[in-house]
Amino acid sequence: MTDAPRRRSTPTVPAKAALEGLEDKWGERWEADGTYRFDANAPADAVFSIDTPPPTVSGSLHVGHVFSYTHTDCIARYQRMTGREVFYPMGWDDNGVPTERRVENYYGVRCDPTVHYDAAFVPPEKAPKNRRDFLAVSRRNFIELCVQLTGEDEQVFEALWRRLGLSVDWTQTYTTIDERSRRVSQRAFLDNLARGEAYQADAPSMWDITFRMAVSQAELEDRPRPGAYHDLAFHRSDGEGDLVVSTTRPELVVSCVALVAHPDDERYKPLFGSTVTSPLFGVEVPVVAHRLADPEKGTGAAMICTFGDLTDVIWWRELDLPARAVIGRDGRFAADTPAWIESDTGRNTYEALAGLGVKAAQRTTVELLEASGELLGEPKVIEHPVKFYEKGEAPLEIVQSRQWYIRNGGRDAALAEQLIARGDEVTWHPLYMQTRYTNWIEGLNGDWLISRQRYFGVPIPVWYPVDADGEVNYDAPIAPDAVTLPVDPQSDAPNGYDEAQRGQPNGFVGDPDIMDTWATSSLTPQIAGGWDHDHELWAKVFPMDLRPQAHDIIRTWLFSTMVRSHLAEGTAPWRHAALSGWILDPDRKKMSKSKGNVVVPTELLQQHGSDAVRYWAANGRPGTDTAFDETQMKVGRRLALKVLNASRFVLGFSQRNDQSADGGDDAADQAATGARATPLGADAVTHPIDRAMLAEVAALVETVTAAFEEFDYARALERTEAFFWNFVDVHLELVKTRAYRDDDGSASARASLELALSTLLRLFAPHLPFATEEVWSWWMDGSIHRTGWPTTAELGGAGDGADGELPALAAQVLHEVRRTKTEARTGMRTAVRRLEVSAPPELLDRLETVRGDLVDAGVVQEFEMTPTDAGADLTVSVELVVDDA
């Protein structure tokens, strides 16, 4: 909840204002006062809940993080000032591959589940340069190192967020590997399993040979890589010559199960139903037809191998072909010769490939094909997109493996349509981002693969029975009771068994895999919102009001959260989704730790100050990629400093007046009458230019409020900043002399300036929280961030009916005076001997109301107004006093 502005009787304005030290001063005060603490007793309709993205804990934050999290914070601060009780938690995404890789490199260790736990283990003092020399440690020791290092990283992250001024409630935190997250993640998975939404399948899956794990479609990325088309001769079984295919993966000829062409391709229609034998190995395979074959690609005929790419998987499934895989999970060709190679020549040939990695096997295969005469012509060099795991270093392979999946519409058109419709329940900022969400769903080719063959993550919470012959029955998973969660099947025994039965006949085995980190991150609303332990809180915060995130993870975090909410709650998980763009380096490439082109924000915050860095970030429009530009931080620092100094100037009028009332030259008279300074209100604003300025302030409030209601923090800042500079450069200069006086005109100037300052500070507060809080403390009680958002009603109608064009007319005259002095290379306090304004009488009548202010601001000795014909332009003539010296 918020309070109305409470002005103290006399401002306390410092002799000099500075930005240095404000972060520490106000950060400590906000924490001590609980300024941003969420009130769980607030009614549900007063709550504004944010599904804060938990940053990945795998090193350090970069300016891209500062960029997007500032956007969220601006929105949170605005909502809090409008009276909403803001639920703004912070999580840390500390499990998964990035964390494991950081721990491996930091300590020089690698996880080996066959190694026994060492309770006294101490990691090496220095990590070896070569990963092959990393020390093998037990799974438990490895997890302990992960917990230790991520805990240290999280403290650094929190310190940076606090310095940036994020108005997070730091009592509402979690990590994606803590007990609460593991319990929520496992319970949600078991609910999916009970409803038939989670299932296990032994099927082809994308496989990263470096990390030795399966990956999902959402984690794939195409990278351009050199390659070559090789024309291979398959021999027709009828002896009528060869059928030539072009392939970029000649090494997979050993895994070929068929040749395929488009059913309408006249070249191959006579061959459909016939067979050919493969080069080198002499394996007979059929020639088949399928609509996905491209007549324009290569020779129009292609190998179906198990498995070269995802199209191979489709062909294999739909044409019911056999599986003949030779590439193992280690990325090497099988050591044993496959049974389907029956000829002695073929078996001898395979011995040259056994145990080789994919690249070596390709080179060897090409050499063998050249020697056999079955490679036709020279390879045609190309560059083509190759599938990689987004965090991987080697091209993905497709291997057969048993994995867990959650249904996501990739194989269910009805579910896909339901998820697309859920997108309509969300207001997208910017709107076009919904198209990316829809396009992703429409492009899915399978369900969500959630199991990972790694160590630091939430364990798949099931066991499998072992029969009397020692065979594992994967079709009858044993689930734990909900009250026992979280569990680790690698160290806990299922109900009804004891540890001695692990791996024994009539015993059990635990599922060795963990869940993909997105499987847990997809439940951030449930984790933060108390889904399984605080039902009253959950009812208040869900569906959440806002999901802020980067646009590149729509396919992962946003979509996966939508899937889990749709399946469990039957609703979209949020009302709004605000998408931030990327930060680009000077080469217009996305900044990322993996690319090594990031800028660490710590030094920027120290050099420019937090408000300046926030200013740079808040200028990035929603959904738009933005180039890193340190010069904008310098502009932001100048703005924050101007806010301090302009506020000192404005409050100096009131301080001077108030101190005079309390004990100035007329102190005796005032003491006798009991007179004291009293804050001036809107009713004191009587001067036409002051009223016109407040009319502009009222319009600004409406514009900025509308921008924030549309989650457009950038437009809100842009409009506020533009008005502020005009306010200090023109209006303040115009009225300052009048404000120093002691008459009705002075009261009008001071009252209007205070009203404008109070409003502008609050409009700036979401973007510049430290400078605005500092100024607010000089003359107002309480925190500006718990004070109500400005409204036009606060202005008391002072601007109603004001001459809206008067400020621009006065500014035009003042501009000409300043321009003349600048061109004459003289100071602004140089006197003007004669100022003449020529304009139609109607304009002159309006300018007459600000004659005194123009004379004071321009240091004018003689001011003449010359009427012209109606419709003529306003012209200004300036004659300066000549310095005879």
Model region roles, listed by residue range:
Residues 44-52, 74, 125-133, 158-165, ...:
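Active-site-adjacent bridging/hinge elements
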Residues 2-3, 231, 444-519, 523, ...:
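Feature 926 captures the class I aminoacyl-tRNA synthetase adenylation module centered on the KMSKS loop
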Residues 42-44, 53-54, 89-100, 173-181, ...:
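Short, solvent-exposed turn/loop segments enriched in Gly/Ser/Thr/Pro and often Arg
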Residues 22-46:
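Positively charged, low-complexity intrinsically disordered leader regions
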Residues 2-11, 15-16, 24-25, 29-33, ...:
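Residue patterns forming the tRNA-binding/recognition surfaces of aminoacyl-tRNA synthetases
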Residues 27, 193-220, 253-256, 478, ...:
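Amphipathic alpha-helical
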